[in-house]
Amino acid sequence: MNRGELYRVYKGSKHDPKKYRIFVVVSRQVFINSEYSSVICAPIYSNYNGISTQVPVGVQEGLKYDSCIRCDELISIPKSMLTDYIGHLSEEKLEELNKALRIALAAEYYFEY
């Protein structure tokens, strides 16, 4: 498992009406490789509003439809639920994801990059 990989998760949340949702792993690689049983993920939705905390994704990443990663809705998911691999983000998309995560967490105000 690597940062930036997309996985289909069946019934990821009891509040989600969909049968499954696709998530992208956003935890840092050292945490993913650790003994911890969960990783931080961001959900992917089909509707894109163009806000700064959303990253557009689509067929290039292994999806059927144009969609977006929502960095304002991070959740912890057990690694054992991340088994249905869909695809991965390009280096360019990972940079967009990093920027959207910094905005979502207000991290650009606290850290110099």
Name each model-derived stretch.
Residues 16-20, 25-59:
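Compact nucleic-acid interaction/catalytic patches
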Residues 61-113:
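C-terminal terminal-subdomain/extension
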